[in-house]
């Protein structure tokens, strides 16, 4: 193979080298595989001459991300008169990875994220630790509630418990992978590949801006991640390589309701989904009331009724064009 790193929809080339060591002539050679569809077969008839070598280049595209083990592939070879045929298995095995397509975020989306990032840096989300880190003598301005009475009585002086201020993650991203399989057949081009590629682009953009992220992915089975640096990006990439959309789920009215307490801990919420319906407006409005900014990215147009229901909230809905 010419390259070990490929992306969905990208042209992949495999070079095949044959040596016919027999006296027979073989015509109409076809390449069969468990990872290449009919369009990926050899485009024209190939003939293997007796005692001759032949180099063939196979061009194909893989429409879906994943790790492909190319161990089940073979040649179907017909005789000269096309009366009989036989299949020859390849002994050599190879594995290649097809990654989600890289998407450059549109300028207007970059500006949205930049505004959130700048506000986040200027307004850190902090809380006081539940346990004190050390004890010090009381000074004017210290909280009287934090006095360590037992130690103060023993030392005959006032001592206070000191608590660390902990910086909390400001930004949370919720990714809905559940509804793609329930979309009508009128949207054949809308797949989870687009959703995954877009979510990875936003995650990467934020991490490269040194933003910590709480990431929640719903795919019938929930998965959550704390992302703090660029190395964490690759753990999410690995997750997406191993997981596809599994089926329909009630993301807004069941999944997000369970997350209300966690959502309240973050000032900025991004939701990435396929679309939002009027029946989701109540849940979305409740989420928006507990955060500074709620941005929902959709792959499909949102009904006007939904937009009207969210008009007087701080919710921004962005239709993504991939």
Q: Residue locations for each model-derived region?
A:
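An amphipathic, basic-hydrophobic helix/alpha-beta surface used to engage anionic
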Residues: 1-224, 268, 272
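Von Willebrand factor type A / integrin I
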Residues: 15, 242-322
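General structural signal for secondary-structure boundaries
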Residues: 63, 140-143, 190, 229-232, ...
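Short, surface-exposed amphipathic charged segments that create phosphate/polyanion-binding patches used
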Residues: 111-113, 231, 310-313
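Disordered, low-complexity tails and leader-like regions
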Residues: 139, 154, 182-184, 220, ...
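Short, conserved, surface-exposed binding loops centered on an aromatic residue
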Residues: 163-165, 205-207, 228-231, 259-263
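Short, glycine/charged-enriched secondary-structure capping and boundary segments
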Residues: 187-189, 230, 284-287
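Short beta-strand-loop
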Residues: 217-243
